Amino acid sequence: TFEPIQERTEWAYKKSLLNEYNDSESNILSVANNQRILHDFVFGRDLEFENLPIQKRPKTYFPHRTKTTLRYSFENEQIIALNQQIEIDLTLEFNAVVAIFEAKNGTLKDFNIYQIYHPFLYYYSSNLPLQNIICCYLLRNENSLKFFAYTFEKPLQLDSIKFLKSKEYILRKD
């Protein structure tokens, strides 16, 4: 059994764009993190974004899986993927821009486009007032992190992928 609650605090909760968009266990962690409740509970009061309303703060949504039906095209072929399972490693949201992440360990030469396209299409089809969706691959090696960003110029076309930018962060151990 859990121990009794030692303290109760009323917390001003302001719903954000993707809060409660899915009902996964990781989403509630995301909401608690984005509302800075996790920080308050573990570390005490958070002053980093004290002067910004919660809607203006960057938000993190942890890994989750969901199922949905996706409709799109590849070259001239129409595709309907019924009850398609989608796994999203991480989602960031800031000012109506959503960045989805697919993370891999090791050195890869290429990737499966579906790993970023299906999450892209999931958010694109959500009817949420999003301004932009950025798809990111993160490759982790022993001493570096490599990031690659893409989007889709024609959201309903799998083959409209567009490279945006890349950057490697070399991790220096001091």
Predicted ranges, named:
Residues 1-114, 118-174:
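Charged, terminal alpha-helix-loop-beta segments
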